[in-house]
Structure formats: C-alpha cells, structure tokens
A protein has these predicted regions:
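Extended, highly charged segments
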Residues: 1-68, 98-107
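Phosphate/anion-contacting hairpin/loop surfaces
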Residues: 68-145
Length: 145
C-alpha cells in the first residue's frame, strides 16, 4: 500500500496539471473497490484547480465556467494503485481510468490510474451535494480530523 510519502509525491507530481482542462475521460474498467461513476466523462471541459492530500486520499478539485458547482475526484490508491502521466502512450492492462488534460498550447497529457489489485477508488463528488451523496467526504475523511 502506498505510504504517506508516496501519496505526497504523487500529489506533487500532479501539480503541473493545475490549470489544465480535461478533454477526454475513458473508464476502461469501472470495477474498483467502489464502482466508478458511469458519468465520469462529465468532467470534460472542467479545469483542475487544486490538488490536496488528506492522509492517503487525494482530492482533485475541478471548476467549469458554465457550471457553478465545484466537482472533486476523491482518489485512494489502495494497495497497488498509482497515478501516472503519459504523452502518447497506450494504456496498459491495469490502467482503469484515463483522463486527458490539455494545456493552453494544446499539448495533451494523459493521467493513467493504474491498479492491478483494484483495491483503490475514484469517487466523483459534486461539492454542493456532499450531504446527499452516499460516498461523501464525511464518510471517508471525517475520522481523520
């Protein structure tokens, strides 16, 4: 299982994606610890605005100019998960989610969520609806203080 230093290193490696726009989302294998939302491709057009770490959870905040609600991906890497950035690389066997980001020059970077054991999770949270959603921050993060 990735320890805190690895999760923090992952967070820091993702920071160059802040300010970039999601251009494509591909869920290749939706079954992880919790099923990945079928409408995760709704992130297309959103801009990554902030990345946070709470214990071993990563929180990626997204904003869209035409949608006032902030959306967050809550990610846990599980025992064998990783987030890796690639340019023009085909997905590997255990790459479950691919998210394409475009910078202001149109350069595409693909974020691969790789998890051979499938113990990790990716939850899509709409921040206005935290209380009404069964998989909320509170459920996973409240005990962290």
């Amino acid at each position: 299982m990735p320890e805190l230093p690895e999760v923090e290193t992952t967070k820091l490696s993702l920071e160059p994606l802040i300010g970039q726009t999601v251009t494509c989302v591909q869920v290749r294998h939706p079954r992880l610890r919790y099923d990945i939302a079928k409408d995760l491709d709704g992130l297309v057009g959103f801009v990554l605005t902030k990345i946070q770490r709470r214990a071993k959870y990563l929180l990626l905040d997204f904003y869209h100019a035409h949608d006032s609600r902030q959306k967050t991906l809550l990610i846990h890497l599980g025992m064998s998960g990783s987030l890796q950035q690639h340019i023009n690389e085909p997905p590997r066997k255990h790459d479950h989610v691919l998210i394409d980001f475009a910078d202001s020059h149109g350069k595409i970077i693909t974020l691969h969520y790789h998890d051979p054991r499938r113990f990790g999770m990716i939850l899509w949270l709409i921040n206005d609806d935290y209380i009404d959603q069964p998989n909320t921050y509170a459920r996973f993060l409240a005990h962290l203080g």
